[in-house]
Amino acid sequence: MKHFSVKACAKINLGLLITSRRDDGYHTLETIFAPIEWHDTLEFTESDKIGMECTNLDLPVDDTNLCIRAAKALQDYAGISKGVSMKLVKRVPFGAGLGGGSSDAAATLNALCRLWEIDVPSAVLHRLAVKLGADVPYFLEMKGLAYASGIGEELEDLSLALPWHVVTVFPEVQVPTAWAYKNFHRQFERPVPDLKALVRRLCDDRDLSVLDAFENDFGSVVFENYPVVSQVRDTLEASGAQFVSLSGSGSAVYALFENRALADETAEEMAGKFRVNVTPAGFRME
């Protein structure tokens, strides 16, 4: 009986600029995705049906779960009746803007191609991923920094890794994505900076002067309405970090540090109140 486990890493957004609202209600955006070491573990075992258990009992394991949906979508595409027993060891907070559920779904697609021994064209996997969630393709296809546009599904591999240590803090509150999109302050008419060029200057040249361009359009409304998220931001800004930002629509906040010892010290101080992760400089997903 085949059995193996895989990691499903989270992400942060370096800048998140919402550029328009489409007729179908979705918003277009530009962002830089960067992976962080904070990860879930998924275990896959051959079975005669699709089933799942999770270490976090607050997460449903029915057809609303992205891993179950990913497995059934792949099963339907391949026209097979094989099953899988999945166990999700959940570490990445949900409702945090870290893409944990999307990463789990992407890991499921990749793992089941291996477990079920099916050869699925990359274009088909991409389409299945987009149907599951706009940022699922990032976790499916990329290892390091990527530029994303459209609704987040149009990707360009930048072949870069962040040269800073990343401290990511979950303030123990969830920000509903739908609420964030309904309430953010629209700036559709503003000129959009060239995020790809700026992130190359940031990573290749260590040009810290470009950091102010990496705004997150959800930041102001989330900080205004969630005092604990604002508190986490203020603490990180006072710690000596080079840059502090909301990730996605929140609630997680991250900080970039040049000095690993300072990153570890800051994380240790905050770990008494919040869940915290430190990702080393140069990190890429496996």
Swiss-Prot record:
Please list the disulfide bridges. none
Key words, A-Z: ATP-binding, Isoprene biosynthesis, Kinase, Nucleotide-binding, Transferase
Record's InterPro entries? Answer: GHMP_kinase_C_dom, GHMP_kinase_C_sf, GHMP_kinase_N_dom, IspE, Ribosomal_Su5_D2-typ_SF, Ribsml_uS5_D2-typ_fold_subgr
Q: Which PANTHER family match?
A: 4-DIPHOSPHOCYTIDYL-2-C-METHYL-D-ERYTHRITOL KINASE, CHLOROPLASTIC
Pathway entry: Isoprenoid biosynthesis; isopentenyl diphosphate biosynthesis via DXP pathway; isopentenyl diphosphate from 1-deoxy-D-xylulose 5-phosphate: step 3/6
Q: Which family does it belong to?
A: Belongs to the GHMP kinase family. IspE subfamily.
Q: What is this protein called?
A: 4-diphosphocytidyl-2-C-methyl-D-erythritol kinase
Q: Where does ATP bind?
A: P93, F94, G95, A96, G97, L98, G99, G100, G101, S102, S103
EC number(s) per entry? 2.7.1.148
Outline what the protein does.
Catalyzes the phosphorylation of the position 2 hydroxy group of 4-diphosphocytidyl-2C-methyl-D-erythritol.
Determine the domain of life of the protein's source: Bacteria
Query: Which chemical reaction does it catalyze?
Result: 4-CDP-2-C-methyl-D-erythritol + ATP = 4-CDP-2-C-methyl-D-erythritol 2-phosphate + ADP + H(+)
- GO BP, one annotated term: terpenoid biosynthetic process
The GO molecular function terms of this record are: 4-(cytidine 5'-diphospho)-2-C-methyl-D-erythritol kinase activity; ATP binding
Which Pfam families does the UniProt record give? GHMP_kinases_C, GHMP_kinases_N
Concerning HAMAP family, the annotation shows: IspE
Which residues are the active-site ones? K11, D135
